[in-house]
């Protein structure tokens, strides 16, 4: 718990005494890069509030700052040696950089609708691109539709296009999840960064369940995010997860990822659904995601 409190304190303190080192208005938002001591953060200035999208420690860029980013690596308890990775939503490129270091032979495609975000990630957050790592300016749903037409498949699909102020509603519908499922390789997994404390929770859960069946929530205390892990065929055994924890612990510890704690934060929805059976599924015709998220409770 102390780690989570310390992270929150660092971010709060940094925000209060930050220097703006870059500012621009893109086609989609106001973009800021702020520095406070050792911490550098990418922020979107929206609705009279700054929301942090990505942060790094300048002295140790590989050490992850945000808890939700760390939660994403619970995926590795479900899949082994991913070789084709799709990330929708770039931020500062943190996830891409870490995955590339862990799996240097993997092909990683980063899809980001805002070209200014990609440039900021390159210029200020050491986002790495090479023959294995690419970025593309495109709407995430359009990319997935075209990937499906090309019969492309991915072992690990990470949906990270949401923030606390705005949700692209077309990326949170049954139809979109069906499109995502169509490009998911056998034995692959979808990891979605989402919320655990708003009225959207039940609708989102019902929608994932309608497409993928039972899924796993990864939540740790003192954290307002959850990671949904979906698309797997069978739940790993306790023994299998323990073996993966042992294997992954030394690989992930340099990034400040406590994989054992993440394994304890996993809970399956099998015989454990925490939303009403009559919860309305989000569709292209019905997706008031931002209104539901605003009315948190």
Protein language model features and the residues they cover:
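Rossmann-like AdoMet
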Residues: 18-70, 74-78, 101
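C-terminal substrate-binding/active-site "lid" region of AdoMet-derived donor-dependent transferases
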Residues: 177-240
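The AdoMet/dcAdoMet-binding core of the Class I SAM-like
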Residues: 35, 63-189, 223
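Sec-dependent signal peptide recognition
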Residues: 1-8
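N-terminal signal peptide c-region/cleavage motif recognized by signal peptidases
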Residues: 13-15
């Amino acid at each position: 718990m102390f780690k989570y409190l310390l992270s929150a304190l660092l971010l709060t303190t940094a925000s209060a005494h930050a220097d703006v080192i870059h500012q621009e208005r893109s086609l989609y938002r106001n973009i800021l890069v702020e520095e406070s001591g050792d911490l550098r953060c990418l922020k979107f200035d929206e609705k009279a509030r700054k929301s942090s999208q990505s942060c790094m420690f300048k002295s140790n860029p590989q050490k992850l700052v945000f808890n939700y980013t760390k939660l994403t690596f619970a995926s590795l308890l479900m899949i082994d040696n991913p070789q084709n990775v799709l990330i929708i939503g770039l931020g500062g490129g943190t996830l891409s950089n870490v995955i590339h270091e862990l799996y240097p032979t993997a092909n990683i495609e980063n899809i980001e609708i805002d070209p200014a975000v990609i440039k900021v990630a390159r210029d200020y957050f050491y986002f790495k691109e090479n023959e294995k790592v690419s970025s593309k300016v495109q709407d995430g749903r359009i990319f997935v539709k075209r990937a499906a037409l090309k019969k492309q498949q991915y072992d690990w699909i990470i949906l990270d296009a949401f923030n606390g102020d705005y949700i692209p509603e077309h990326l949170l519908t049954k139809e979109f999840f069906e499109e995502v499922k169509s490009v998911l390789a056998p034995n692959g997994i979808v990891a979605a960064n989402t919320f655990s404390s708003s009225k959207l929770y039940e609708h989102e859960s019902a929608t994932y369940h309608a497409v993928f069946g039972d899924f796993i929530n990864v939540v740790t205390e003192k954290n307002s995010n959850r990671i949904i892990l979906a698309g797997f065929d069978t739940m790993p055994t306790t023994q299998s997860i323990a073996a993966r924890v042992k294997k992954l612990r030394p690989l992930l510890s340099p990034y400040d990822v406590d994989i054992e704690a993440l394994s304890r934060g996993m809970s399956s929805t099998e015989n454990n659904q925490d939303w009403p059976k009559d919860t309305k599924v989000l569709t292209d015709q019905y997706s008031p995601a931002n209104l539901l998220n605003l009315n948190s409770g």
